[in-house]
A protein has these predicted regions:
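Long, highly charged, low-complexity intrinsically disordered interaction regions
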Residues: 2-5, 63-81, 91, 417-515, ...
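A glycine-rich phosphate-binding loop feature that marks nucleotide/adenosyl-phosphate handling sites
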Residues: 179-186, 319-323, 377-382, 401-408, ...
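Structured, non-catalytic alpha/beta "coupling" segments that mediate domain-domain communication
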Residues: 75, 89, 99-102, 226-239, ...
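Generic start-of-chain signal for non-secretory N-termini
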Residues: 1-21, 28
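Single-stranded RNA-binding regions, centering on S1/OB-family and related RNA-binding modules
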Residues: 542-710
């Protein structure tokens, strides 16, 4: 079975069997995807995280299918109907739909029309009709008129019911209809009569019809949502006449009275059994594909958001802006600890701008603030303008930060534990400030689904979505690495090999024993075994550690290699890291071993070049157009600066500084053809856009980037 799996995975994924075998072996030993991708390149042949995850997903699917096979085999054996030929077919089948087709005739059924007919003794009549030789079947049917069968027509109808079930359970028939659905199924949606007003948001789908194979994931999910809400009536299917003709060619072999009865049974089988069954199958299959696409888009957006550029360890003022209730202001030190909070009222109805600025200036000086983070919600533009109208005594950078999900964090258990003595407004402002300092460290505290970068996220498979988003967060956290002495429990939880319990144990150990001075000290943490240490150590950094390698992505298992490099050059590790000239003299091929290849050595040399480098780029200041505050200020043809706020498979949404985001359709993103928005844009990217159309009634803005960002 194992070799079969390896062969099938290789064919499906285009990865050599040996690499799949070794990757699965590492996964079965408890190695994580980030660890395997980073530190076991020689073993896997350099597979990346996406490939390793694909191996795991497909392997799990095959295992599920194998379990289903066992259940089916057991069920057929219990009925005493297993044959050598049937067993061989089951053994050779690795397609879910085919497997279920094989099992269908043996599957326990509720009391079907065919079953009732069999109980009435009509199966021999059905067999007679299927042979299609009898010139006068009605005459032969008279023998079956007894008991619950009242007349010849009832006998014929019962026989047709048995034939219809046989047609439905016939593999060739099912594949015939399945192929028709695959090639030509049309998805049709219509508004439910009398619900036009209630269904206004689904106006685009009030009377739409398109081939299923060309229906994009976002359209399909929107249509299915409308159906779930009882606002749209949805159907799916190929040409019925063509399908029944195909089935008749399979089963009707004579143009006599028996053949006519079989033709009737075939039409009934298609309409009552086959079509609904295959329609359900294709509805589920198309929904699964749409889910996978929506989840892929969400995960990619989340990755870009988590890997947004950090300001770094600077003293920051966070402002959660507002009108009536004022602006909540907090001051944080370079480690993100809360130093001070108060309210200011620069806007109506209170309108105390002079007093507000005086307070801001005093806080800037008292707490030596280096940057200001303003939430991008209500009163954001007004607060930014209020601050920029004044001249500060010191050089201060002002940033507008997304506050999506901040309110969810502020009311969460995590926030209450961090700030038990403060209300939600303070916690929200702190979150805004910390997002500027380190988006990744702050956003891991929030359920990814609350961050607002998904499409139809509530309509997709929730367990699959959670798994994908959790893996995305884990991937990002391990890509960046974390400071072992400052990372929160929530951040540490996502580190390879840790999880909630070990993460909490690390924080507890830190509180009791002070800062870690070396990675080896991790082995003193309760429940930290050698395997967990192996998995996590390379992703945890200790700035200013006695061993400088403890602040790099070099794994402790490779320290001896770096030490040997330094020894061969007549220096210590610190001198090797500090001297470009010394590093030029390293000949990596000298350090090759049976287990350490060139990929690992190249990674080590990159780390020595830039120890503990952050893969996230430097942060940039951005300004919206000062003349645009609301949708009423917009004009067609206007060119504006914007920030990409969300990406879907049909385009990108851009924040242009007003309440409503504009949409740049896929066709308007570039001067060339692109199939994926991620080819040209990323979350939080600064872009220039031109307004194509404004729909004031529906609050929709169409934008273009063609010719704007060259």
């Amino acid at each position: 079975m194992t070799q079969t799996f390896h062969r099938m995975l290789s064919a499906t994924l285009g990865i050599p069997e040996k690499q799949i075998e070794k990757t699965l072996s590492l996964l079965s030993e408890g190695a994580t995807i980030p660890f395997i991708s980073r530190y076991r390149k020689e073993v896997t042949g350099g597979l990346n995280e996406v490939q390793i995850e694909a191996i795991q997903i497909q392997y799990d699917k095959l295992n599920e299918l194998a379990k289903r096979k066992e259940t089916i085999v057991h069920a057929i054996e219990e009925q005493g109907k297993m044959t050598a030929e049937l067993q061989k077919r089951l053994d050779e089948t690795w397609d879910s739909a085919t497997l279920e087709d094989i099992y269908l005739p043996y599957k326990p059924k509720r009391k079907t029309r065919a079953e009732i007919a069999r109980q009435r003794g009509l199966e021999p009549l059905a067999t007679l009709l299927m042979l299609q030789r009898e010139p006068n079947p009605e005459k032969r049917a008279e023998a079956y008129v007894k008991g619950e069968v009242k007349n010849v027509e009832e006998a014929m109808k019962g026989a047709r019911d048995i034939i219809a079930e046989q047609v439905n359970e016939n593999e060739r028939a099912r594949n015939c209809i399945r192929n028709a659905f695959s090639r030509q199924a049309i998805l049709t949606a219509k508004v439910v009569k009398g619900k036009e007003e209630e269904a206004a948001k689904f106006r685009d789908y009030f009377d739409c019809s398109e081939p299923l194979k060309r229906c994009s994931s976002h359209r399909l999910l929107a249509i299915r949502r409308g159906e779930a809400e009882g606002l749209l009536k949805v159907s799916l299917g190929p040409d019925d006449d063509e399908c029944t003709e195909r089935l008749e060619r399979l089963f009707v072999r004579s143009n006599n009275a028996c053949g006519q009865q079989v033709a009737q049974a075939v039409q009934d089988a298609y309409k009552r059994l086959l079509k609904p069954s295959i329609e359900t199958e294709f509805a589920a299959l198309s929904k699964e594909r749409a889910d996978d696409e929506a989840i892929r888009v969400f995960a990619e957006n989340l990755r870009q958001l988590l890997l947004a550029s950090p300001l770094g360890q600077k003293r920051v003022m966070g402002i959660d802006p507002g009108f009536r209730t004022g602006c909540k202001v907090v001051c944080l030190d370079a480690q993100g600890n809360l130093l001070h909070n108060e309210n200011i009222y620069p806007h109506p109805p209170v309108s105390k701008p002079k007093e507000a600025f005086a307070k801001v200036q005093k806080m800037l000086e008292t707490y030596k603030i280096e940057a200001i983070a303003i939430g991008n919600g209500t009163a954001s533009r007004e607060t930014e303008e209020f601050l920029k109208q004044h001249t500060f005594r010191q050089d201060i950078q002002i940033f507008v930060v997304s506050e999506q999900g901040a309110s969810i964090y502020s009311a969460s258990k995590i926030a209450r534990e961090e700030f038990p003595d403060y209300d939600v407004t303070v916690r929200g402002a702190v979150s805004i400030a910390r997002r500027l300092m380190d988006p990744l460290a702050e956003l891991v505290k929030i359920d990814p689904k609350s961050i607002g970068v998904g499409q139809y996220q509530h309509d997709v498979d929730q367990s699959k979505l959670k798994k994908s988003l959790d893996q995305t967060v884990e991937s990002c956290v391990n890509l960046v690495g974390v400071n072992l002495n400052t990372a929160s429990t929530h951040l540490l939880t996502y580190i390879s090999g840790l999880g909630p319990q070990l993460a909490q144990n690390i924080v507890n150990y830190r509180a009791e024993n002070g800062a870690f001075t070396s990675r080896k000290e991790l082995l003193k943490v309760p429940r930290m075994g050698n395997k967990a240490f192996e998995q996590c150590a390379g992703f945890l950094r200790i700035p200013h550690a006695k061993n400088p390698l403890d602040n790099t992505a070099v794994h402790p298992e490779s320290y001896c290699i770096v030490e040997q490099m330094a020894k061969d050059l007549g220096c210590n590790v610190s001198e090797l890291i500090a001297s470009k000239e010394l590093r030029k003299n390293i000949k990596p091929e000298r350090y090759l071993t049976p287990t350490v290849g060139m990929p690992t050595l190249q990674d080590i040399l990159q780390e020595l070049e830039k120890p503990g480098r952050d893969p996230r780029g430097p942060i940039k200041v951005f300004e919206f157009d000062k003349n645009v505050r609301t949708i009423d200020d917009l004009q067609v043809g206007m060119e504006l600066p914007g920030i990409v706020s969300n990406i879907t498979n049909f385009g990108a949404f851009v924040d242009i500084g007003i309440k409503e985001n504009g949409l740049v359709h896929l066709s308007q993103l570039a001067d060339r053809y692109i199939s994926d928005p991620n080819e040209v844009v990323s979350i939080h990217q600064h872009v220039r856009v031109k307004i194509l159309n404004i729909d004031l009634e529906r609050k929709r803005i169409q934008l273009t980037m063609k010719g704007m960002n060259g």
